[in-house]
Amino acid sequence: MAEKPGAIAKMVAWQKEHISDRQMTLILAFVIGLLASVAGFFLHSIVHEIQILLTSGFEKSTYNLLFLLFPIVGIYLTSLFIKYVVRDNISHGITRVLYAISTKQSKLKGHNCWSSVVASGITIGFGGSVGAEAPIVLTGSAIGSNLGQIFRMDKKTMILLVGCGASAAIAGIFKAPIAGLVFTLEVLMVDLSMASLLPILISCVTATCFSYILMGEKSLFDFTLTDPWELDRVPACILLGVFCGFVSLYFMRAMSACEGFFAQLKQYPYVKLLFGGIILSSLIFLFPSLYGEGYSAVNILLKGRTEADWDMVMSNSLFYGHSQLLVLYIGLVTFTKVFATSATNGSGGCGGTFAPSLFIGGFAGFFFARIWNIYKLGVYIPEQNFTLMGMAGVMTGVMHAPLTGIFLIAELTGGYQLFIPLMIVCICSLLTISIFESHSIYALRLAREGKLLTHHIDKAAITLMGMQSVVEKDYHPVSPDLPMGKLVSEISRSNNNFLPVVNQAGVLLGIIDITRVRHIIFRSELYTRFKVKQLMLQPSAVLSDHEPMQEVMKKFDETDAAQLPVVDVNGVLKGYISRTRLYSTYRQIVADMSAE
């Protein structure tokens, strides 16, 4: 007797019968925006409550030894949560979303809908020097992905729903709907069309509205424009953009080096936790501005005017009360932030690089303006404005996302009057870093593996194909010791123009090219004289079962082969790829991507 369908199956069946997929996509976009804003609210609530509980009683004018303890405790608790509750890797949130889009048909695991919120909340609340944005983007994307899986959406709609989740996360956490939209286009590289624009906008607006309801109207950054932009500050804006480009390059290279170092300690988790925790705690003790996301320190730079304000930036540190050392403090914090972020994630914490890029950008912009004004390198430039522009510049460089940098900072602060200088800084920053790095910090790992989805439709189609979608397994392997007479009967049963030659372990030794032996297979007097190993040839190329599809296409172009064998790391034959099927699949994906 067949089992009765469950409630979800009945709901999906009803939807397929009464609601079109297009209409359902719009409904899901609204739901995704709502849930993403709720997730962002919970994360910020967790972080805020933990930080209030731990640090509200600290005397601002003196250092506190508890800064040496809290970060290590937070990372340890996060590690326990991930190891015993989640039991999965949840690091590199935005990179994980890009990977899912490129290689997993936009499918993210169910626990990603909540696990990053809890893990990053603990990490940041206890002082981890990372951001909440990447975990929320992963959460929003996972909500979109899982809803898409429940309602059995096609591959293209799945990508769109993941994009809705990511855009809603950014829009909700920053109350910046336009920034959420352009983030999805620039960073996740979801193609914009009329079919995709409306769902993403619905998610962004919904998330923003519910964030206002849940968290009030207060903006994340408190900025009031008191010194309007003037044309004679253009040279300073250009130089700030170049400076931000090099700061972004330093951030990316240092992060990559630190990640590589901690990866070497993967087999020693407690050593990694202790080592990274000590580095993080020491840096936070010396520079308390590194505690958590650090947005409170950035806000002081945005509205500070007096020595008392600058002392607040250096509160709880050994620098407190020495406002003459502000430039040194700002420079050291800018330099060490990347190590604090790397130590947090490398030792077992959970968080992103979105907030650190904003933090470093704000401090770098203030540092640039203060040095410029101290040494009178040109006309006076307002430090608060350049703090803001530095945030946009470094974010643009790190993420290769100039529109996101421009619109996010403008929406966050209401600083639309600074649109022109923001554009100048972001353009110069992107031009500078593009000389050294062609991909964002999120895309760099995937680009090296050939798994990055881009706006280039040909490259995107190749990336989306995936090895498993084109591998064929209807082959007839033969033994190298098989007599030629029996080979003839195997040829008669084969639908291909080649036969793979394998040993008893299944390892590929060569191939029999039927077109090459056709002239002798009907000579019966040779049937006992020759064996397969005397007739086999080496294939013109061999494909690995984990080879990037760009390399697969390249080998077909170089060899002009009709088929190429696919083997695993031990050389065991796993199947073959035919040129005909490869290009047929490619053309179908291009057609699907081009359709509205």
Annotate the PLM regions.
Residues 1-464, 468-469, 473-474, 478-509, ...:
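Alpha-helical transmembrane segments and immediately membrane-proximal extracytoplasmic
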Residues 203, 425, 472, 514, ...:
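ATP/adenylate-binding site constellation spanning eukaryotic-like Ser/Thr protein kinases
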Residues 474-478, 534, 539-542:
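Structural signal for short hydrophobic segments within the conserved structured cores
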Residues 478-495, 502, 521-524, 542-569, ...:
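The conserved cystathionine-beta-synthase
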Residues 509-517, 576-583:
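Short hydrophobic beta-strand motif reused across regulatory alpha/beta modules
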